[in-house]
């Protein structure tokens, strides 16, 4: 279990958020519903989706490293 109030918990949450938003960008219905706004509070979802799609290799490597850390080291 990961504590959200620690640094590694925030990193896990951020990676999962970016990966989820990048997945939402690939689903047409979710893209129009959730990622239509580019500013404001709802714009955070759009920005995370853009980060997830443009840096997909780095995000994937970070997810694998974080999974290894959470499962075996922590």
Swiss-Prot record:
GO cellular component, one term: Golgi membrane
Subcellular location: Golgi apparatus membrane
Superkingdom per UniProt: Eukaryota
Membrane topology: Single-pass type I membrane protein
One Pfam family cited in the UniProt record for this chain: DUF1242
Signal peptide: 1-22
The keyword rRNA processing belongs to this UniProt entry's keyword annotation: no
Residue intervals annotated with topology Extracellular: 23-52
Residues spanning the membrane: 53-73
Membrane topology, Cytoplasmic segments: 74
Any Gene Ontology biological process: constitutive secretory pathway
Keywords: Golgi apparatus, Membrane, Signal, Transmembrane, Transmembrane helix
Main localisation: Golgi
Function recorded in the entry: Involved in the early part of the secretory pathway.
Family per similarity comment: Belongs to the KISH family.
Record's protein name: Protein kish-B
Organism: Homo sapiens (Human)
Taxon lineage: Eukaryota, Metazoa, Chordata, Craniata, Vertebrata
């Amino acid at each position: 279990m990961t504590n959200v109030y620690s640094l590694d918990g925030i990193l896990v949450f951020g990676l999962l958020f970016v990966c989820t938003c990048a997945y939402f960008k690939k689903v047409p219905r979710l893209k129009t519903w959730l990622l239509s706004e580019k500013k404001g509070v709802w714009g955070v979802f759009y920005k995370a989706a853009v980060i997830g799609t443009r840096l997909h290799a780095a995000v994937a490597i970070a997810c694998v490293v974080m999974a290894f850390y959470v499962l075996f080291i922590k």
